[in-house]
From Swiss-Prot:
One of its GO terms (biological process) is unsaturated fatty acid biosynthetic process. Keywords: Acetylation, Chloroplast, Fatty acid biosynthesis, Fatty acid metabolism, Lipid biosynthesis, Lipid metabolism, Membrane, Oxidoreductase, Plastid, Transit peptide. The lineage of its organism: Eukaryota, Viridiplantae, Streptophyta, Embryophyta, Tracheophyta. Chloroplast omega-6 fatty acid desaturase introduces the second double bond in the biosynthesis of 16:3 and 18:3 fatty acids, important constituents of plant membranes. It is thought to use ferredoxin as an electron donor and to act on fatty acids esterified to galactolipids, sulfolipids and phosphatidylglycerol. This is Omega-6 fatty acid desaturase, chloroplastic. The histidine box domains may contain the active site and/or be involved in metal ion binding. A motif (Histidine box-3) lies at residues 367-371. It catalyses: a (9Z)-octadecenoyl-containing glycerolipid + 2 reduced [2Fe-2S]-[ferredoxin] + O2 + 2 H(+) = a (9Z,12Z)-octadecadienoyl-containing glycerolipid + 2 oxidized [2Fe-2S]-[ferredoxin] + 2 H2O. A motif (Histidine box-1) lies at residues 171-175.
């Protein structure tokens, strides 16, 4: 997913890959850079093809075996690097921080390692996700209507999570992984986005660029990190960014929603017609749906039944997308340095959440396979992720949702410096960083 924050933070720490067979570490600003030997992964696709021809491909399970990358012997014991990554994982709230992916691994190598079944569209499963979202949303509205005031936050949390599922359904439609009928996808995607006041086509056009240029400086439309020049440009902007990346960070997708999707001048001429239709659908919901809600329940009812669940949706939109691509060890690269396979496999994070959240949100948190191929339907992401774990597991970033992970992101990953690592607001502008103390006080430091 996408998803959905205009400005994101990534550390300028990049695990340097070298053909030198030695392994060494050096520390800078509390974060270690690693040099390690590159495994020989050329001809990976050919090895797999030969296996298929010889009939060695496993047919009994969805997760199929392929040639697994194996590093050549190193001059230092591999436990050195393993122990170092374990220490980083503990510090940042991760279960695993992946080894650096070698330069000569390509997206084709990774995609061809996935079983063909994970790309197959199943209409029954697709419409099953719609049933789950509609049913869970209806239950949420019932809970809001019947709950006493002190239980309303729980009802809002459930309903906001349920309508996040609407976004994921539209997300599948935008990636052409919901139905083989493209008109059906356009209609379902538009309808799913309408109650979120999200214009479907404008989002789709911008989100496609996020996938083609993930973690690329200046180019990734969903992930544009704060740079030093942003902080230095204006006191007003600096103050706004400190608040936005402090207590308001888990709702920053609202800023992205407002800025990116409503100006037709931001789209190519060939995109304007479809963008206009989506905007008309959104405004129709506002003009018809909002007055109807207010007529039936009053302004308080509009707040209870629409606004609060909508804010709950944006909480998840922001949280998912922050965690998907933000960590002290995940680099942002210029277009000249950028490597597609490294950005999609190692620059993306798979995070486990409580299962009820994953069910209502259709496994959008299983995000690495989605970045390997957006054509994988949401209901096949777990099978694809299992295959990636079998064949590329050592390179994957894996946390479970926990306080230390969020505390690290919220209080550390602020200003991106091309010549160093993440710099927190507390270090860069200590006299103005009081808003950062709020999440620092509220969020416990345990994983």
């Amino acid at each position: 997913m996408e998803s959905a924050i205009t400005i994101s933070n990534h550390v300028n720490l990049a695990f340097s890959l070298s053909r030198n067979p030695s392994l060494s570490t050096k520390n800078s600003a509390g974060i270690s850079c690693i040099k390690w030997q590159r495994p020989c992964l050329r001809n990976l696709g050919h090895v797999r093809l030969n296996q298929q021809r010889k009939g060695t491909r496993r047919k009994s399970t969805l997760v199929q075996a392929v040639a697994v990358p194996v590093a050549q012997p190193s001059a230092f014991p591999p436990t050195d690097n393993t122990e170092h990554l374990k220490q980083l994982a503990e510090r940042y709230g991760f279960q695993q921080i992946g080894e650096p992916l070698p330069d000569d691994v390509t997206m084709r190598d990774i995609i061809t390692s996935l079983p063909k079944q994970v790309f197959e569209i199943n209409d029954t499963k697709a419409w099953g996700t719609v049933l789950i979202s509609v049913t869970s949303y209806a239950l949420g509205i019932f809970m809001i209507a019947k709950a006493p005031w002190y239980l309303l936050p729980l009802a809002w949390a459930w309903t906001g999570t349920a309508i996040t599922g609407f976004f994921v359904i539209g997300h599948d439609c935008a990636h052409k992984s919901f139905s083989k009928n493209k008109l059906v996808e356009d209609i379902v995607g538009t309808l799913a986005f309408m109650p979120l006041i999200y214009p479907y086509e404008p989002w789709r056009f911008k989100h496609d660029q996020h996938h083609t240029k993930t973690n690329m400086l200046r180019e990734d439309t969903a992930w544009l990190p704060i740079m030093k020049e942003d902080i230095e440009s204006s006191p007003g902007l600096r103050k706004a960014l400190i608040y936005a990346y402090g207590p308001l960070r888990t709702w920053m997708s609202i800023a992205h929603w407002l800025k990116v999707h409503f100006n037709l001048k931001d789209f190519r001429q060939s995109e304007v017609k479809r963008a206009t239709i989506s905007l008309a659908a959104v405004f129709a919901f506002m003009v018809i749906g909002w007055p109807l809600i207010i007529y039936k329940t009053g302004i308080v009812g509009w707040i209870k039944f629409w606004l609060m669940p909508w804010l709950g949706y944006h909480f998840w939109m922001s949280t998912f997308t922050i965690v998907h691509h933000t960590a002290p060890h995940i680099p942002f690269k210029s277009s000249k340095e950028w490597n597609a396979a490294q950005a999609q496999l190692s620059g993306t994070v798979h995070c486990d959440y409580p299962r009820w959240i994953e069910i209502l949100c259709h496994d959008i948190s299983v995000h690495i396979p989605h970045h390997i191929s957006p054509k994988i339907p949401s209901y096949n992401l777990r099978a694809a992720n299992q295959s990636l774990n079998e064949n590329w597991g050592e390179y994957l970033n894996k946390p479970k949702s926990n306080w230390r992970l969020m505390r690290t992101i919220m209080t550390t990953c602020h200003i991106y410096d091309k010549d160093g690592n993440y710099v927190s607001f507390e270090k860069a502008v200590p006299e103005e960083s009081q808003p950062i103390s709020i999440p620092k006080r509220v969020m416990p430091d345990y994983a």
